[in-house]
Amino acid sequence: MFLEKVGNHKRCNMLYDPSHYVLQNLDYLAHIDIYHEKIKMFHVKDAELNPSGKQGVYGGFQSWVNRAGRFRSLGDGQVDFKSIFSKFTSYGYDGWAVLEWECCLKHPEDGAREGAEFIKNHIINTTEKAFDDFAGSGADIEANKKML
């Protein structure tokens, strides 16, 4: 839709923020599968959506603490960051992963300290070779007979 309107211009890219997808009840993992080539930056930000009989996605008249949808510190919300970082790694993502923090409960200094460590612990160091690379190297029949 939007890409069509801009003629799929090469400079039209995306800042991926899974917290907003949680609050919209969108599949943020499938979004990576669809748009991974356009994602150039990633806001590492958590959120939770806990709808009730009185409020859902749109609970804007409540304080942030009492809203059904609210931002949380990394790891305290509903975003599956292990899956996100795994998907980005599998697609060869080499863009920025930036902490964005707006928790309605936790102190900002705690959020920043914990957030930096959280991101560091989720970054995947990509392997240089597959676990079964040895399989294509051929077999030493005589050595195998000797071992057996």
For the regions a protein language model found, what residue spans apply to each?
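A structural alpha-helix within SAM-dependent methyltransferase catalytic domains
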Residues: 3-4, 36, 85-89, 116, ...
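Terminal-tail/helix-coil boundary detector
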Residues: 125-148
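A structural motif corresponding to the C-terminal end of an alpha-helix
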Residues: 6-9, 83-94, 126
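Acidic/histidine-rich catalytic cores of soluble enzymes
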Residues: 1-78, 130-131
